[in-house]
Amino acid sequence: MLSPKRTKFRKPHRGHLRGKATRGNKIVFGDFALQAQEPCWITSRQIEAGRRVLTRYVRRGGKLWIRIFPDKAVTMRPAGTRMGSGKGAPDYWVAVVHPGKILYEMQGVSETIARQAMRIAAYKMPVKTKFLTKTV
């Protein structure tokens, strides 16, 4: 699973998921992409599940780029803990995704294979997605 090697702060604020993605919303590396249509937090486990689906489906044929990285720690308190006594310990990592953000890019396979692979990977995502092709 993906996680940062080190961060400036252990326990970040939750923040708001307002607005659309202004960066990372265009196809840069590959020819096909999976784009988020809704705001959400995507966990490192979900990113890894999508990556496994895509790599297994395209075999050795294609190249894959993951365009998001889980750099925000989500804290959890133990079950049955009373209120107070501070914030919980970091439990898992999430990538903050705004609408329009590219999640995965792919190259080196036909459009039908890429579309099918991205469709299967989209089932692993907690958000509505859209398949994009690079326009010249």
Swiss-Prot record:
Per the record, the major location class is plastid
Q: Tell me if Signal is a UniProt keyword of this record.
A: no
In terms of Pfam families, this protein maps to: Ribosomal_L16
What GO biological process terms does the UniProt entry carry, in alphabetical order? mitochondrial translation
Q: Which GO terms describe its cellular component?
A: chloroplast; mitochondrial large ribosomal subunit
Q: Which residues form the signal peptide?
A: none
Q: What molecular function terms (GO) are annotated for this protein?
A: rRNA binding; structural constituent of ribosome
- Which UniProt keywords are listed? Chloroplast, Plastid, Ribonucleoprotein, Ribosomal protein
Which PROSITE patterns does the UniProt entry name for this protein? RIBOSOMAL_L16_1, RIBOSOMAL_L16_2
- Compartments, as annotated in UniProt: Plastid, Chloroplast
Check the record and name the HAMAP family matching this protein.
Ribosomal_uL16 (MF_01342)
According to the record's subunit comment, the protein's assembly and interactions are: Part of the 50S ribosomal subunit.
What is stated as this protein's family in its record?
Answer: Belongs to the universal ribosomal protein uL16 family.
The protein's name: Large ribosomal subunit protein uL16c
Natural source organism:
Chlamydomonas reinhardtii
